[in-house]
């Protein structure tokens, strides 16, 4: 992890926009691979990906996952295999206070409907908000 942190620091110094994100790869209930780009957060214990518990990806993270990062500014990539675990509720509550208003509104929406659920139209989404 020390080398990862040093390389990520170098990518941040180079203002690499990819230093803030990673690709999380999982396998869905049908055995199909799923990959999505997420913000990669630093926490004292290591790294964190914030995943809404109502999202299908939360269930998928309960097994083995793969994380891929690519920092073009320093020509370095990492492929990491890991297991995920939930962060303490206190940590999540503190972090949530730092979020911008729009993501907070989206969190409220996810309490009404599961994340990644189909929305029939933009108007329907705006009506929910």
Regions from the PLM with identified roles:
Residues 1-129:
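Binding-site signature for planar aromatic cofactors or substrates
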């Amino acid at each position: 992890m020390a080398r990862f942190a040093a390389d990520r620091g170098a990518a941040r110094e180079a203002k690499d926009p990819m230093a803030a994100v990673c690709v999380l790869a999982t396998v869905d209930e049908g055995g199909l691979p799923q990959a999505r780009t997420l913000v990669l957060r630093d926490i004292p214990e290591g790294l964190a990906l914030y995943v809404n518990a109502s999202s299908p990806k939360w269930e998928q993270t309960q097994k083995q996952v793969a994380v891929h990062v690519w920092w073009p500014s320093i020509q370095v990539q990492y492929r990491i295999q890991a297991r995920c675990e939930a962060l303490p509720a206190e940590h999540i509550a503190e972090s949530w206070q730092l979020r911008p208003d729009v993501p907070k509104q989206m969190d409220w929406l996810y309490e009404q409907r599961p994340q990644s659920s189909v929305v029939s139209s933009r108007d329907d989404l705006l009506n929910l908000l």
